[in-house]
Curated annotation (Swiss-Prot):
Involved pathway(s): Protein modification; protein ubiquitination
Domain topic, free-text comment: In contrast to other ubiquitin-conjugating enzymes E2, residues essential for lysine reactivity are absent: Pro and a His residues are present instead of an Asp and an Asp residues in positions 88 and 119, respectively.
Active site: 86
Predominant subcellular localization, coarse grouping: nucleus
Protein's name according to its UniProt entry: Ubiquitin-conjugating enzyme E2 L3
GO MF: ATP binding; transcription coactivator activity; ubiquitin conjugating enzyme activity; ubiquitin-protein transferase activity
Higher taxonomy: Eukaryota, Metazoa, Chordata, Craniata, Vertebrata
The reaction(s) this protein catalyses: S-ubiquitinyl-[E1 ubiquitin-activating enzyme]-L-cysteine + [E2 ubiquitin-conjugating enzyme]-L-cysteine = [E1 ubiquitin-activating enzyme]-L-cysteine + S-ubiquitinyl-[E2 ubiquitin-conjugating enzyme]-L-cysteine
Family membership: Belongs to the ubiquitin-conjugating enzyme family.
UniProt-annotated location(s): Nucleus; Cytoplasm
Length: 154
């Protein structure tokens, strides 16, 4: 139950502070271990859409890290076709129980805004990003327009 108490507090903080890049947060009050929300990137080529993510917290949270899955398809070297993301802050070896969910979300937004081709989950996209940025951006922008969700209007 410690996980639920902490998650309730973290959710309250996030809602109170109003993160402009993480919106439309949905949490089932009966199950605080699953959150959904929209990532709203600032940087091209992802600034034309929003991306729904799901955050799954283990029952052992905060002693074990959450898992993040993209529910919206995204053309990104660090996010695979199944929506799994390579995010160092939530890897088992880097995870620290003091890390809060808003920090995890900020790291995720930073990664989406600024891909890390040196740690790819999709080598083909990492190569395209590194060798032909213009082509990558064109493909990613088209993909975002096709699959991305509507950005929330303030």
């Amino acid at each position: 139950m410690a996980a639920s108490r902490r998650l309730m507090k973290e959710l309250e903080e996030i809602r109170k502070c109003g993160m402009k890049n993480f919106r439309n947060i949905r949490v089932d009050e009966a199950n605080l271990l699953t959150w959904q929300g929209l990532i709203v990137p600032d940087n091209p080529p992802y600034d034309k859409g929003a991306f729904r993510i799901e955050i799954n917290f283990p029952a052992e949270y905060p002693f074990k890290p959450p898992k993040i899955t993209f529910k919206t398809k995204i053309y990104h070297p660090n996010i695979d076709e199944k929506g799994q993301v390579c995010l160092p802050v939530i890897s088992a070896e880097n995870w620290k129980p003091a890390t809060k969910t808003d920090q995890v979300i900020q790291s995720l937004i930073a990664l989406v805004n600024d891909p890390q081709p040196e740690h790819p989950l999709r080598a083909d996209l990492a190569e395209e990003y590194s060798k032909d940025r213009k082509k990558f951006c064109k493909n990613a922008e088209e993909f975002t327009k096709k699959y991305g969700e509507k950005r929330p209007v303030d």
